[in-house]
Amino acid sequence: MAQGWRQLDVGVIGGGIGGMSVAIALRRAGHNVTVYEKHDFAGEVGASVSCAANGTRWLHEWGVDVQKGDPVVLKSLINRDWKTGEPVSTFSLDDYEQKWGYAYNMFHRQYMHAMLKDCALQGEGAGPPAKLLVNHACQDINLKAGTVIFKNGVTAKHDLIVGADGIGSAVRGILGIHPAKRPAESSCLHANVSTDQAVKLGLVDYSQNDALEYWGGQDGTWDKIVLSPCNGGKLLSYYCFFPRERGDYTTQAWGADDRPVEELLAPYPELDAQVKAHLAIGVEVQPWRLWVHDPYPYLQKSNVCLLGDAGHPMMPHQSQGACMAIEDAAAIGIIFNKSYFQGDVREALEVYEKVRLPRATRVQAAAAKAAYNINERIGFSANKDNCATYKVEDEKKTLTIEEMNAYDMYKDVEEKLTQVRGEKFLAPYVSGLPIGLQMPNGVIVGA
């Protein structure tokens, strides 16, 4: 086994949020990074993206200028009655930052991406700036040689290759993972609403709540509206779910022609009139294709690993997709830093898989449950005493804020490293959680 830290030449396939995050993490760890983006620009499509404390902490640790992303700092989660709009379940986040050390941010996806890209590529900050090459679509990888072959005829050899190329990952298939995916039982249309326009029309100003707001989700049906404020509250991002038989968009990709607003309103004859009036002025109405992926058997092979949606695509109902990609990036940055990396890429990737696969798989499963039961969603899952319609599949297995935010990735990495190296781990932690930590559902870590 190689001994001692060495600087690696790293290739990152995919220039989205996950790709830029891992470029920053590896840059901070002292490595040379090239990001390859298949399109002629590195950007993002979509609208709002949620970044809870378990994601935000890494942005701060990496020195990202979070204010560039123009975030909304969330103060509560509100679940409203489908017909009346009255709150059914509310979870306060007033002491969230004080308790967990970092804010719960909502970003516009494009702003968040620009914020990360600037940090990865700029001259300021620790580590060599990452390089970005566009129009480089991955065609194949020679796993023995560590060489990436691109569709434009270029080849590039790297010590480490990170597949951050999203839900339709090419790298995933090259590693031999061919998922059996199936359409979700719900469809989703997304729309943006200008707060200024809503206020001028005399509609409710939801931006004042600084909240993630939900209509429905309590009765086991697929009907649900999710409101995410972003751009400092200037933009309201609506995700509108309904049974797939009322509209199947599995063959339509985001970025095609906008759907008519009448199509957005049609599934909801009994929806709360106040939020329905917001949807009526919605623009950029786009379908979001939803697919259910079973957990993948592994995340790495040879000198290649998967990150984010390439490695563990999940339903959006825990608002943890971006955070899981950021955590993946953080894990790679830690494992390959000067404290832990001893020069052996294979060992490091084995540790990465041991750290990330169980946690991401757990969130993946919890997101699927929250699709039809809002009480399974982090936050609401601890609201048993404050919600008359509270019901979950198994209270002992619910995902909680404590499990997400009390997690110490450094301790998890150390534990998995000792396992791989045949050493003893003595710190009072289990998979990054402190022994003795009591969850709201009564579960005690290590008991």
Segments the model singles out, each with a brief description of its role:
Residues 86, 103, 114-283, 296:
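Conserved FAD-binding catalytic core of PHBH/FMO-like flavoproteins
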Residues 70-73, 131, 266-284, 342-350, ...:
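Acidic/histidine metal-binding catalytic segments
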Residues 2-7, 84-87, 318, 334-447:
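C-terminal helical "tail/cap" subdomain of flavin- and related membrane-associated enzymes
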Residues 46-119:
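Active-site-adjacent segment of FAD-dependent monooxygenases/related oxidoreductases
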Residues 38, 90-92, 135:
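Residue-level detector of high-confidence beta-strand sites
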Residues 12-32, 36-39, 162-163, 189, ...:
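Conserved mid-domain beta->alpha element of the FAD-binding
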Residues 2-11, 38, 42-54:
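Accessory recognition modules or surfaces
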Residues 9, 32, 235:
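Residues at the starts of beta-strands that form the adenosine-phosphate
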